[in-house]
Amino acid sequence: MKLVIQRVLQAQVYIDDNLFSAIGPGLMLLLGIHHQDNLEQILWSVDKLVHLRIFNDENGKMNRNVKECEGEILVVSQFTLYGNCLNGRRPDFIQAASPPIALSLYRQFIDELKKEAPHVKTGQFGAQMQVSLTNDGPVTFILESLDRRKA
C-alpha cells in the first residue's frame, strides 16, 4: 500500500459536480493498492496512520496524532500511485492491484481504519472525482507498507 498523507484544514470530494464527502481539520489520504498487498499491509498501514505524530502540540512541535486531535480522515483510492512513468510516454500500472482485488482491500482498509479512528469519510472507489483541499503546513508524507522491510 502506498499512502500519501496530507495534513489539511479541510478537504472535499465531488462526483459529477456534487459534494460527496467533506472533512474539517485532519488528514487527506490518497491510497494506492499494490498487487502484493494483503491484510498484513492493511493492519500495518492503519496502525501507522492513526498513530503518526504529525499534528502540533502546544509548543508547535509535531507530537500529536490524528486521534489525539480528534481530526477527521478522508480516504480517496488512487491506483495511479502505482503508475510507472520511467519507460515510454504512457504510464503502466502493472504494480497496481486489479480493480476487484483493490476494491476488496480498499473496503478492508476502511473497515479497519474505522475501528481505530471515529471520523472517517471516503471518496467513491473507481469514480472520476474532483478533490480539493487546503494543506496545513504544508505537511505531506508518503508511506509505503512494502518499504517497511527496508527500515
Curated annotation (Swiss-Prot):
It is found in: Cytoplasm. Its EC number is 3.1.1.96. It is an enzyme of class 3 (hydrolase). Keywords: Cytoplasm, Hydrolase, RNA-binding, tRNA-binding. Gene3D superfamilies: D-tyrosyl-tRNA(Tyr) deacylase. It catalyses: glycyl-tRNA(Ala) + H2O = tRNA(Ala) + glycine + H(+); a D-aminoacyl-tRNA + H2O = a tRNA + a D-alpha-amino acid + H(+). GO terms for biological process: D-amino acid catabolic process. It holds the Pfam family Tyr_Deacylase. Belongs to the DTD family. Homodimer. This is D-aminoacyl-tRNA deacylase. It comes from Protochlamydia amoebophila (strain UWE25).
